[in-house]
Each structure stands twice: as structure tokens, then as C-alpha cells.
Amino acid sequence: MLKEFKEFALKGNVLDLAIAVVMGAAFNKIVTSLVTYIIMPLIGKIFGSVDFAKDWEFWGIKYGLFIQSIIDFIIVAIALFIFVKIANTLVKKEEPEEEIEENTVLLTEIRDLLRAK
């Protein structure tokens, strides 16, 4: 059972997924801090409120925080889209060459020999 788990864990797809999760978590922290500490204060200054995210609420519904989460999501989605587009262009899938069956090769050789006579 341990051997099967080792084979599963060391497959390329599982390792790629694990790396993607760790990188995604780290990237999410960067984007969250960008939105929280740079973008939202700028939006707050534009609308005349120092803390846009926390000050904007209506009947206890903090829609400022919701807007901040939406901006956070949009930035992550755009960055991931760009990353995937770049990765897809770098890793082009090679089209498999058409394999000719052995029978076809032999028949072609026989045909060529008969034509030569």
C-alpha cells in the first residue's frame, strides 16, 4: 500500500498540482495585499473615504469588503489567465506522427518490388 501511494504521489500530475496549490496560495497573499494596501486606499481617496472597504456598509452589510473581494478575484483571474496563455504558448503539444502499420509497410515494399520487375 505504501508503494502504491509513493507511485501515486510521485506522478508528474500530482506534483504539478501540489506546486500549483502552493504557488496559488502565495500569489493570493500578494494580490490580497496589493488590493488591501494599495488599490483600496486609492479608491478610498477618490471617493473621499479613508477606509473604503470597512467604512462602506448599509444596515450592517459591509459591501465595501465585498467590493474589495471582487477586485481581488478579478486581479487573480486576469493574472492566471495571462499565466495560462503564456504557459500554453511555451508548451506546445506536438502532434503525434502518423504511424504506419507494419502490414502496410510490407505491402508497399512488395508493390515496389513488383513494379521494378
Swiss-Prot record:
Disulfide bonds: none annotated. This is Large-conductance mechanosensitive channel. The keyword Ion transport applies. Homopentamer. One of its GO terms (cellular component) is plasma membrane. It is found in: Cell membrane. NCBIfam families: mscL, PRK13954.1. Gene3D superfamilies: Large-conductance mechanosensitive channel, MscL, domain 1. GO terms for molecular function: mechanosensitive monoatomic ion channel activity. It comes from Staphylococcus haemolyticus (strain JCSC1435). InterPro entries: Mechanosensitive_channel_CS, MS_channel, MSC/AndL, MscL_channel. Its main location: membrane. It is a multi-pass membrane protein. Belongs to the MscL family. The chain crosses the membrane at residues 7-27, 30-50, 64-84. The keyword Transmembrane helix applies. Pfam families: MscL. Keywords: Cell membrane, Ion channel, Ion transport, Membrane, Transmembrane, Transmembrane helix, Transport. Channel that opens in response to stretch forces in the membrane lipid bilayer. May participate in the regulation of osmotic pressure changes within the cell.
